[in-house]
Amino acid sequence: MIFLLLINFGIKGYWKMKSYSFDSQLKEVWETCHEKGFSEDYCILVDFSRPSGEDRIAIIDLNTSSVLDTGPCAHGRGKGNSAWKPSFSNKEGSRCSSLGHFKIAEKSYSATVGLRFALDGLDDSNCNARRRNILIHSSRYVGIMHHLTSYLPLSDASWGCFTTSPAMLKKIESICDKSKKPILLYAYKSS
């Protein structure tokens, strides 16, 4: 099994990976936060054009325009998805991820995924997020596999949710807990 994974997905290098720049999204995100009453201190960006096992999700300090932390983020396993290429949908039952602006809503716990945050979709591309039960949650699978491969093999870790490592979810929890205003999550895919 491990051998097949290495052949199919490659061994992820432990050398310094190229740094990721989210500069082109920061102005638009800050304006959205300012106009709609979101935290102007922090936001979460998810760049679906990056490989799922690499630094695809980022916590951004909007005051300094700096990246505080990054981590892996699995995409949904719905129809048309592969480990290399996500497809997107807002339809119930699609098991695909959605793009756009989301409000990070209430925190809760479940027996299946543990700590989780509900998401409210704010755009036409994700307005069914609450009905679809799209969440931010973690998976040990994502936490382990991102050390081995740049592309996370599709699994039940995500049916459209933003599934990250347990360590990254704790960092997201920390900024959500200390913020007096809701945090914006913006998911996008560059061409």
Positions of the model-derived regions?
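Hydrophobic membrane-insertion alpha-helices, especially the h-region
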Residues: 1-8
